[in-house]
Amino acid sequence: MNRNVFLKNTVILTGASLALRGIGMVFRVYLAAQIGAQGMGLYQLITTVYNLALTIATAGIGIAATRMITEEMALGGGQRLRSLCKKLLLASLVLGLLAAGLQFFGADLAAGLWIHDERAALSLRILALSLPVIAVMSCLQGYFMARRAVGLTTGAQMAEQLLRIALIMAILPAALGKGLGEACAAVVLAGTAAEVVSGGIVWWGYRRDLRQVPGSGKNVPAKGVLRRLWSIGAPVAATRYVGSTLRTLENVMVPGCLAVFTGSRELALEQFGALKGMAMAVLFFPFSFLTTLSTLLLPEITEAYAQ
């Protein structure tokens, strides 16, 4: 382990994570002022369903990519790296397209049966378009984590957040007069566009970095990639699928229970938006430190085990 690199990456990731969460919380205040507590409640329900699809698209891919690429660089000298990355990216894209198809074509069903609000369907379809991009980005982030080069992905995340905020502030006022459904659609459209731009930045950085890896130009075929990907990613994915499903069910049930208690679906959405949109964001703010350390330790432990 190169301690200087590890400490540098820890500082970069922790600082960026804190900055992103801080900017996000401040922006939530602006967003809540624009669309109201009820709009925040609807938006949170939309993201609840989206997060389930996001788990299907990305669970296990980033961790598997980090481990497999770290092992290849430690033992294989990078000769099979190009072939390995192609197969990992293809698997990521397939999962992303699968999740996108499920969410896009199941948007009406999810809006009616889970969210109990037909206004959510348009936003779910828009968000589905971002899933293939995010799935591929998850794999590329695993690549850069294995390379101990987190600067590019961190910069892309910062650019994504700032672009998302700028786009929301630009297009949201025009959608506010059309209803909460259209307002939420404007918010997620801005987020989807920002994801695509961020994905393009990371892809450009990956293509540039791969050429600099010693031995990567030989393009030696990597064998057993899918089997190895399954053995690493399946347990992680299964755990996250269960956790994400339970969280989705919980978040879907809470507004219904609040509606029974208050006697009003609108008031229930307002209370749910205040809870999930603001209070929980503040509560989970300190987890930035734990997430950073656990992420950075993975390639170090993998390399030590491989050697």
Predicted regions and their residues:
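Short membrane-interface helical motifs at transmembrane helix boundaries
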Residues: 98-121, 175
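Interfacial transmembrane-helix starts/ends
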Residues: 7, 44, 77-94, 226, ...
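Interfacial/gating helices of multi-pass transporter permease domains
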Residues: 31-52, 184-185, 224-232, 255-284
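Residue-level recognition of pore/gate-forming positions within transmembrane alpha-helices
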Residues: 17, 21, 48-51, 87, ...
